[in-house]
Swiss-Prot record:
NCBIfam families: RNAse_H_YqgF
Coiled-coil spans in chain: none
PANTHER family: POLYNUCLEOTIDYL TRANSFERASE, RIBONUCLEASE H-LIKE SUPERFAMILY PROTEIN
InterPro entries membership: RNaseH-like_sf, YqgF, YqgF/RNaseH-like_dom, YqgF/RNaseH-like_dom_sf
SUPFAM superfamilies attached to this UniProt entry: Ribonuclease H-like
Region described as Disordered: 1-25
Domain of life: Bacteria
Gene Ontology terms, MF aspect: nuclease activity
SMART domains xref list: YqgFc
Name of the protein described by the UniProt record: Putative pre-16S rRNA nuclease
GO biological process, one term: rRNA 5'-end processing
Record's GO cellular component terms: cytosol
Length: 170
């Protein structure tokens, strides 16, 4: 296994590892809260699900595993917040550790890491543009960031799958 501090983000749409049709779960890991999003069964559109509070007892891991089971997720995508200098900081290490712990709970469902630089900033901007006041953003910002992480993964996956299709049609 690759040491956590050297683990790069995964790439969507790899035919050897893509689970095919089915819902994907997107997760934005924060220090206090975890945003959760889910895709439709065709893996085209990400929508918010809920915000899970973190705690020391691991209840948040149980809830995330329960959501993966309830939603019949075929893949779980955890945001990896690398620095702009492409390094792993404390937040990224936390995301990797949560992904590894969750992977043990949801096996054999794969848990992937997705590059998520600036998704919270992007989510805040989108909420602000939608007219959501700053005081109201806290309740949904984690879910919005999870949607951004998952939607990016889904879009990259579709593009990669289309490229694979074109290559096999030639």
């Amino acid at each position: 296994m690759v040491p956590a501090q050297h683990r790069p983000p995964d790439r969507p749409g790899d035919p050897a590892h893509d689970p095919g049709r089915g819902r994907r779960l997107g997760i934005d890991v924060g220090a206090a809260r975890i945003g959760v999003a889910c895709s439709d069964p065709d893996a085209i559109l990400a929508t918010p699900v809920e915000t899970v509070r973190r705690d020391r007892s691991g209840k948040h891991l149980r809830r995330l595993a329960a959501l993966a089971a309830e939603l019949e997720a075929v893949e779980v995508i955890v945001g990896l917040p690398r620095t702009l200098a492409d390094r792993i900081g404390r937040s990224a290490q936390d995301a990797i550790e949560l992904a590894e712990a969750l992977a043990r709970r949801v096996s054999p469902t794969p848990v992937r890491l997705a590059d998520e630089r600036l998704t919270t900033v992007s989510a805040q901007r989108s909420l602000r543009q939608a007219g959501v006041r700053a005081s109201e953003q806290r309740a949904v910002i984690d879910q919005a960031a999870a949607v951004a992480i998952l939607q990016s993964w889904l879009d990259e996956r579709l593009a990669a799958m289309a490229g694979t299709q074109e290559g096999s049609d030639a």
